[in-house]
Amino acid sequence: CYKGPTTTLPTPDTPRSVAVSIRQFFDLYANVRPIKTFPNQVGPLGEVDFVCVREGTEGLYTGLEHRLSDDCAISIRKITRRACTRIARYAFDMAREKGWKKVIAINKGNILKETDGFFLKIVEDVARNYSDVEWEPYFIDNFAQQLVKNPQRFNQNIAMSTNLFMDVISEEASGLIGSIGCVYSANIGDKYAMFEPAHGSAPKYKGMNKVNPTATILSGAWMLDYIGEKQLSDAIFKATYDVIAEGASVTYDLKGKASTSEMAEAIADKAKAILTQS
């Protein structure tokens, strides 16, 4: 399915996150965000090309929170062998499929010795079945620092972690390509998948026709590839990259002056031309 941005209120006794609920209901355990510099949009830290893989069904996002008293609340971090095994396999399989050589397991095992220690042990066990792919544990604080000092060290790597850690890291990584409006994502399970732009909602821009449509368009294109419409998907991806490279019909966050609809129409026109020629 395809899901657009929604707002989740931060107060107790309000509805849960739509995305989190869908991931858990349909067991969409792999939240995947490609982080790749777009043409003509190289940021101050240079070109990047890696993938963030996030376990999407448990961790601190299981909703196991309790108010013990007026002065104390707790949240339970759930880490299971099943979830760790399948997200590790997904990351290693993706690295192998892409011909990349390393999976990075982001953790805080020196402090969270039980939960992250368990996670790392399972990753190590899974890694034994992938002799062609290296793996490296990385403390989350160090990874976050290196991501803004020398992000190229992670190029052609799969960065993988538990739910909350990778939620934060993938947002930080999105800044490396200039705009969260360019980051598309997929939530993959064994039977179902959900595709969505990585960014949340932005009610302050309602009706202004100014936000970047790239993530929305490319999430849909990725869904087309998932359901077997590779030719259509490839045409939309190429058209989007071409429009951004040309720079004439892009939104303000990409240093342009186009509206949302103008950029979307430019991509649609170019995709139609590509399909007509093929």
Please place each PLM-identified region on the residue numbering.
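Glycine-rich phosphate/diphosphate-binding loop of Rossmann-like nucleotide-binding domains
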Residues: 69-142, 155
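Flexible, glycine/charged-enriched surface loops at secondary-structure junctions
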Residues: 98-107, 130-138, 229-235, 245-257, ...
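Short, acidic/small-residue loops that bind anionic groups at enzyme active sites
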Residues: 20-38, 129-139, 182-196
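Phosphate-binding loop/pocket of nucleotide- and phosphate-handling active sites
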Residues: 259-278
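Short, glycine-/small-residue-rich phosphate/pyrophosphate-handling segment
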Residues: 37-64, 78, 82-83, 200-234
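Glycine-rich phosphate/nucleotide-binding loop
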Residues: 146-248
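N-terminal glycine-rich phosphate/adenylate-binding segment common to multiple enzyme folds
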Residues: 1-74, 164-168
